[in-house]
Amino acid sequence: MLAPKRVKWRRVHKAVAKLNKGRSKAGNEVVFGDYGLQALEPAFITDRQIEAARVAMTRFIKRGGKVWIKIFPHKALTRKPAEVRMGSGKGAPEVWVAVVKPGRILFELAGVDEETAQEAMRLAAHKLPIKCKFVKREKAVTPAAAETGGEANEG
């Protein structure tokens, strides 16, 4: 499972209020691959959920294509044992989560056709606790294409 190698603080504030504010500022475009899976809701996604989604995608695409995981579980959520009285400190770190805001690209995929990518992303989305959508990489306009009018004027 995914987890940081070392952290400065083992126990951190939950900060759920911050999670529900606004959209993702970074990581909201497909950069490495041709297709991506974009989050539509805010959530904490656990290391196990990320791994389950990755396995679902890689099993479907078999040996073709490459998968990039664009999120990492940096935050530790703590939990106290069952039937323990209130107080006496914060519980032990139980699970590692990635803080995901709407608009964040969770996974990227390249080297497969669009139909295969869409089905692989659909299978991955079923393993996650949030609504997601399939997105394609936007073609960057090169300076040479911008001068001549680009692809829109061809034909």
UniProtKB/Swiss-Prot annotation:
GO terms for molecular function: rRNA binding; structural constituent of ribosome; tRNA binding. GO terms for cellular component: cytosolic large ribosomal subunit. It comes from the Bacteria. CDD domains: Ribosomal_L16_L10e. InterPro entries: Ribosomal_uL16, Ribosomal_uL16_bact-type, Ribosomal_uL16_CS, Ribosomal_uL16_dom, Ribosomal_uL16_sf. The keyword Zinc-finger does not apply. Keywords: Ribonucleoprotein, Ribosomal protein, RNA-binding, rRNA-binding, tRNA-binding. Belongs to the universal ribosomal protein uL16 family. Binds 23S rRNA and is also seen to make contacts with the A and possibly P site tRNAs. Pfam families: Ribosomal_L16 (PF00252). HAMAP family: Ribosomal_uL16. It comes from Symbiobacterium thermophilum (strain DSM 24528 / JCM 14929 / IAM 14863 / T). GO terms for biological process: translation. Disulfide bonds: none annotated. Part of the 50S ribosomal subunit. This is Large ribosomal subunit protein uL16.
